[in-house]
């Protein structure tokens, strides 16, 4: 069974969203369920800092020994940070998807109330059951 932290928000595409100290910046990554389905991750194409992203549109990709999967932006905004350590050690996503395996940070305006289709932990758990 995969881990689903209660304090995060989720998408149907298996991304997670975490609040940061700045109320307009959110950290994103792929869920434990997603990394488990992908298998051993060998490469990640990160979004670029300064790039504008649109919710539910592709912003990167993850390559594993099984397949290539697109990463969808869970929020509309601008990329303000990426986890460049994943360039050399993408497998960290497998071992710590909610911690050191984070992918990017997105600056948004309007807060999460304006974000479409975000799921609570119980709703995401139902989706993956």
Model-found features: residue ranges?
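Acidic, low-complexity mobile loops and tails
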Residues: 1-58, 91, 95-129
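A short, compositionally biased micro-patch
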Residues: 11, 20, 64-65, 74
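Conserved hydrophobic positions within beta-strands
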Residues: 14-17, 62, 71, 79
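Short glycine-rich, polar/acidic loop-and-turn segments at beta strand-coil junctions
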Residues: 32-34, 66, 75
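Short beta-strand segments of a lipoyl-like beta-sandwich/carrier module
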Residues: 40-48, 53-54, 69-84
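Short, charged beta-turn/beta-strand-edge "cap" motif at the junction between a beta-strand
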Residues: 59-60, 65-66, 85-86, 110
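Nucleotide phosphate-binding site architecture
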Residues: 60, 80, 87, 125
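Short, Lys/Arg- and Gly-enriched loop/turn segments at beta-strand edges
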Residues: 63-72, 89-92
